């Protein structure tokens, strides 16, 4: 019965809503078109929601800002190659002996540099000069053979060169600290005190001939003491000799040297005796003149206590 009823025709305006957009593909090969709808598809955002949630990048109110590009600091990388040390760094690696050897060789090759080095170098002090002499003394003591007789001819032959080195250095340093090259008497006296002590430490040998070098050193040191004592007596009335205790120091040196410095002791005694007599006469003359002035002025005895009663 139903088949006999004709199907009414669909109005034409219904076809306009079912017309597909030409931009969409009519291909039936798209698998998503035949895929069944699942429950999780309801929770997926649609194209409309995505477009609404997207930031309005094309809006004129929100113009995009360009971030500054990170700065790239380029460091220069020089080519690594070998080169010699600078003079300042080279001198830092040298010890005292090496520097001394270099200066000596340069002065030997170029004599005009010797005077410049002497003028540029600082003046040696008493402590530095005595330190050099003590170094020679230490080298001498370490060369003495252990065991046996330390004053024998064998021991002397072992240390003879060290004795020569010490005495040569002593003869070079001593004139440097004597007037007129040294203007300070106290500096000269301090050097002579230390240098004489170094001579005391020279060994005595069994053979008298081997002791001539030490005796000659005492004679030269006695002459140096006499020169400085006379110069000190001319300056300031010899006050440094009188109040410096040098009479006791020189007397002790003479006793240790076995009387080799007796001439220097006599010179010092004569200077101290002259200064003592001068001080005594000055004090006596001063007392006499003082009493005379008090008598003339009538003030003599004013400061003395007055005695009452029988004398």
UniProtKB/Swiss-Prot annotation:
Residues 38-51 have a biased composition (Basic and acidic residues). Its main location: cytoplasm. Pfam families: Cut8. InterPro entries: Cut8/Sts1_fam (IPR013868), Cut8/Sts1_sf (IPR038422). Transmembrane segments: none annotated. Residues 1-81 are annotated as: Disordered. Residues 21-32, 53-64 have a biased composition (Low complexity). Keywords: Cytoplasm, Nucleus, Protein transport, Transport. One of its GO terms (biological process) is nuclear protein quality control by the ubiquitin-proteasome system. Gene3D superfamilies: Tethering factor for nuclear proteasome Cut8/Sts1 (1.20.58.1590). It is found in: Cytoplasm; Nucleus. One of its GO terms (molecular function) is proteasome binding. GO terms for cellular component: cytoplasm; nuclear membrane. Belongs to the cut8/STS1 family. Binds the proteasome. Involved in ubiquitin-mediated protein degradation. Regulatory factor in the ubiquitin/proteasome pathway that controls the turnover of proteasome substrates. Targets proteasomes to the nucleus and facilitates the degradation of nuclear proteins. This is Tethering factor for nuclear proteasome STS1. It comes from Blastomyces gilchristii (strain SLH14081).
């Amino acid at each position: 019965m139903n088949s006999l009823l004709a199907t009414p025709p669909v109005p034409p305006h219904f076809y306009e809503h079912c017309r597909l957009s030409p931009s969409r593909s009519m291909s039936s090969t798209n698998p998503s078109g035949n895929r069944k709808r699942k429950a999780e598809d309801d929770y997926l955002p649609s194209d409309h929601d995505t477009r609404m949630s997207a930031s309005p990048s094309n809006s004129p109110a929100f113009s995009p800002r360009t971030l500054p590009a990170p700065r790239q600091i380029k460091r220069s990388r020089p080519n690594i190659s070998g080169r010699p040390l600078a003079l300042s760094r080279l001198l830092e690696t040298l010890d005292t002996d090496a520097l001394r050897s270099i200066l000596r060789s340069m002065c030997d090759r170029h004599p005009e540099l010797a005077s410049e080095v002497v003028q540029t170098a600082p003046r040696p002090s008493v402590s530095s000069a005595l330190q050099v002499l003590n170094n020679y003394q230490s080298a001498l003591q370490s060369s003495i053979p252990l065991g046996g007789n330390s004053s024998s001819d064998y021991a002397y032959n072992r240390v003879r060169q060290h004795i020569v080195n010490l005495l040569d250095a002593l003869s070079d340093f001593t004139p440097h600290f004597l007037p007129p090259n040294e203007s300070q008497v106290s500096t000269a006296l301090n050097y002579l005190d230390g240098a004489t002590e170094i001579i005391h430490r020279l060994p005595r040998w069994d053979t008298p001939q081997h002791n001539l070098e030490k005796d000659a050193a005492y004679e030269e040191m006695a002459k140096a003491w006499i020169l400085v004592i006379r110069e000190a007596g001319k300056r300031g009335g010899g006050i440094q000799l009188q109040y410096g205790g040098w009479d006791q120091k020189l007397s002790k040196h003479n006793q240790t040297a076995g009387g080799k410095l007796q001439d220097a002791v006599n010179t010092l005694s004569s200077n101290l005796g002259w200064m003592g007599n001068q001080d005594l006469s000055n004090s006596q003359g001063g007392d006499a003149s003082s009493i005379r002035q008090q008598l003339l002025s009538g003030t003599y005895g004013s400061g003395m206590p007055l005695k009452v009663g029988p004398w």
